[in-house]
């Protein structure tokens, strides 16, 4: 009967995982909530379980609670041991070993409080025996077999404190533990030699004392992980922790990013005086943490790159085999890939690769630059492949020999294409041919005679949407022999450098050779010059008489001198034809306008003015 009660208490203390293991061992259903699992296990026990099931229950219980009270026969001994355990007041006992044995916690529990272990033991005297044998909380091992992940930028020189469990010693939420360690003279010498003074009185060390915290799990190498409400003091001085990382979504508690802690600046660099570390944290149900202290040497990205090169370059045949595997036709697939294009630009720096690198775990051929990748992880160690966003640890990096050959063979291309047989060819950009548009457009040419041309096009009513081009710089005889399409007459205004008289309005054929054009419909020419920008209103040309060569029209028109251009027109030297009319004013301080219109001759009229350095050219196309 006593064995039954003992087994019943053991089963009642099991968690869901232990209950599932027990029911699975007995061949019972192990799905459902904890209450259902517990009822099945107790029913299994009452119905008379086999000795093998009883042995399994005791095995699970010993695994669940490795250290429990064997009995309460000597209650006075338990009381005295508990009182002596809780009475420790000094944070560090004098007989502590230097190699990391911690002292008792500074927080104590009142012996007769209802929540204290002693009170619970005293109150159990009048209760049944199975209630007195309730197990105590599990105590994790002092030095668990915890392995931390290697840090590529640090070489471990020595272990100062082996991984030690942060044991919960009371029922209070906030716990505190103390650890001590000492440095040897050789370790102190190495730290002092590596010291570098920075601006502002700061000091930097390449040989560092490094504190690491992680979960006390032995299943796999652990990453750095901090408990909640962590507070670290080194030799009584508060150590600044990294800032909180932004939460992934609202409603989740912020956590600090896990990383090793460099406590060298707070360590006593002496072999005669030990160093003390105080760690306080908030306990969590189901989570135990471990701490350790190491002496490490910090490395740079250049050192890691040199080590990566010393590992050697991977044979190009491995990459060719991977290419053939990717381009091998799948008989079940309707789409077959016959070629594979790969860029020679680094996805990190957007520049040409210099040291092509990728991880062995990656399935893609695209490489990234090893130097840039190491520099990026030196600033913020993430070790994520920039191509596929998967883990790419330093230990899995390789230098691709095939890409090394490609980069050495062609230095002027940024992309290549792999064929099915593993060969490759460069992908050079195609030069687009310059195509001349079939639709004509207005063309402006500058020459020695025309310094600043400006063309104005007047279209006829018959072809308002059609725009023709007149090239004023063509001097070859081939243009004269061919009959170009019909063009309209143009009037050019240019500055004559060798004019014998200054300020004279002259009409002369242009020295620029132009194609012959046909006459323009008179209806297309405006009857007056009011459409053009002139500083005064004038009389229509048709109403002027050709026998008035010396009449000054400006004296008859009231004009404000400040709006007149500074042109001095003295004489008129141009032949008059039957269909053209010329009006010349010879005022020395006034302005005049010369208009030439011809319907029977294909020539250009040039109005020359030396009063301004910038000529105005009007092309009527």
From Swiss-Prot:
Main location, first listed in the record: nucleus
Zn finger limits (SP-RING-type): 331-412
Localisation per UniProt entry: Nucleus speckle; Nucleus, PML body; Nucleus
InterPro entries in UniProt: PINIT, PINIT_sf, SAP_dom, SAP_dom_sf, Znf_MIZ, Znf_RING/FYVE/PHD
Pathway assigned in UniProt: Protein modification; protein sumoylation
Protein keywords: DNA-binding, Isopeptide bond, Metal-binding, Nucleus, Phosphoprotein, Transcription, Transcription regulation, Transferase, Ubl conjugation, Ubl conjugation pathway, Zinc, Zinc-finger
UniProt biased composition (Low complexity): 579-610
Top-rank taxon, per record: Eukaryota
Keyword Phosphoprotein: yes
GO terms classed as biological process: DNA-templated transcription; negative regulation of androgen receptor signaling pathway; negative regulation of DNA-binding transcription factor activity; protein sumoylation; regulation of transcription by RNA polymerase II
Effect of residue 470 to A: Abolishes binding to SUMO1
All residue ranges annotated as the SAP domain in the record: 11-45
Entry's EC annotation: 2.3.2.-
Sequence motif: LXXLL motif, positions: 19-23
Tissue distribution of the protein: Mainly expressed in testis. Isoform 3 is expressed predominantly in adult testis, weakly in pancreas, embryonic testis and sperm, and at very low levels in other organs.
Residue span of region Disordered: 579-621
GO cellular component, as recorded: chromatin; nuclear speck; nucleoplasm; nucleus; PML body
Binding site for Zn(2+): 362, 364, 385, 388
CDD domains: SP-RING_PIAS2
Record family assignment: Belongs to the PIAS family.
Function (record text): Functions as an E3-type small ubiquitin-like modifier (SUMO) ligase, stabilizing the interaction between UBE2I and the substrate, and as a SUMO-tethering factor. Plays a crucial role as a transcriptional coregulator in various cellular pathways, including the STAT pathway, the p53 pathway and the steroid hormone signaling pathway. The effects of this transcriptional coregulation, transactivation or silencing may vary depending upon the biological context and the PIAS2 isoform studied. However, it seems to be mostly involved in gene silencing.
Subunit structure: Binds SUMO1 and UBE2I. Interacts with AXIN1, JUN, MDM2, PARK7, TP53 and TP73 isoform alpha, but not TP73 isoform beta. Interacts with STAT4 following IL12 and IFN-alpha stimulation of T-cells. Interacts also with GTF2I, GTF2IRD1, IKFZ1, DAB2 and MSX2, as well as with several steroid receptors, including ESR1, ESR2, NR3C1, PGR, AR, and with NCOA2. Sumoylation of a target protein seems to enhance the interaction. Binds to sumoylated ELK1. Binds DNA, such as CDKN1A promoter, in a sequence-specific manner. Interacts with PLAG1.
Domains: entry comment: The LXXLL motif is a transcriptional coregulator signature.
Entry protein name: E3 SUMO-protein ligase PIAS2
Recorded name of the encoding gene: PIAS2
